Amino acid sequence: MAIRTIITEPNKLLRQVSKPVTKVGKEEQKLMKDMLETMYAANGIGLAAIQVGIPQRIIVMDICKEENKKEPRYFVNPIIKNKDPLKATYEEGCLSVPNQFADIDRPSKCEVEYLDYNGQKQLLKAEGLLATCIQHEMDHLEGILFIDYLSKLKRSMIIKKLSKLKLSTAEV
């Protein structure tokens, strides 16, 4: 396993729509393991392949809050089948939008169909933080970031801040 570099906004790659995976093989499994290791190293709870520069429809997550316990989840070619009309608000952040957080409203429940780590078709009924995390990561597959749900002013302020941060770290 290897820790990969996480791409941060502003970056055109993050706005790209990811392509479906044709089959889950050793290469895809290695990518998923690398993504998980990268996510854990960055103290995240979810990561999409596009965030490490791979435009494939793969996401990994682990929302387990118990210390020293891991419950990794792998989603290949996920498709949301149903969304609850009832909304829930969570404070969201993103490894590709470092140190920025905002309250985002999303459907409180969703049903997602996907291929698991072994390429087996699965159906998951998710609610709460899991549903929010799935929808957040699936947005990445469409080139959407959580800041896109904010007002134009807030979004442009965040992007300006991140651009300055990138410039200052590039100069070091």
Report each predicted region and the residues it spans.
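Positively charged
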Residues: 1-172
